[in-house]
Curated annotation (Swiss-Prot):
This is Aspartyl/glutamyl-tRNA(Asn/Gln) amidotransferase subunit C. InterPro entries: Asp/Glu-ADT_sf_sub_c, GatC. NCBIfam families: gatC (TIGR00135). It comes from Lactobacillus johnsonii (strain CNCM I-12250 / La1 / NCC 533). PANTHER family: GLUTAMYL-TRNA(GLN) AMIDOTRANSFERASE SUBUNIT C, MITOCHONDRIAL (PTHR15004:SF0). SUPFAM superfamilies: Glu-tRNAGln amidotransferase C subunit. The gene is gatC. GO terms for biological process: glutaminyl-tRNAGln biosynthesis via transamidation; regulation of translational fidelity; translation.
């Protein structure tokens, strides 16, 4: 399967990323190489090889999920990069008029 520049540009637009023409050329070639490698892996004979779900024999230890009350709002807010009227200000990621 051949990856085209148009496909790379489409994915970049969906991701809201901007690249120069030289970067698009580079990514097109790299993605083509990745797809070709995946096709090669699909051809490997794995008959009789047991499935491997996780290569590390270890379980994840989760902490207890319990709410904690913050005594000091000021302590929390001192680590916030942008604030507005006592709230945490975050960047806009979805435009209201975006139809894509």
């Amino acid at each position: 399967m051949k990856i085209t520049k148009d496909e790379i540009n489409h994915v970049a637009a969906l991701s809201r990323l901007e690249f120069g023409e030289d970067e698009i050329d580079k990514f097109t070639e790299q993605m083509g190489d990745i797809i070709n490698m995946a096709h090669q892996l699909a051809e490997v004979d794995t008959e009789g090889v047991p499935e491997t779900v996780q290569v590390v024999d270890r379980e994840t230890d989760f902490r207890e999920d319990k709410p904690e009350h913050w005594e000091s709002r000021a302590e929390l807010m001192k680590n916030v990069p942008e604030k507005a009227d006592g709230f945490i200000k975050v960047p806009v990621i979805i435009d209201k008029d975006d139809n894509e």
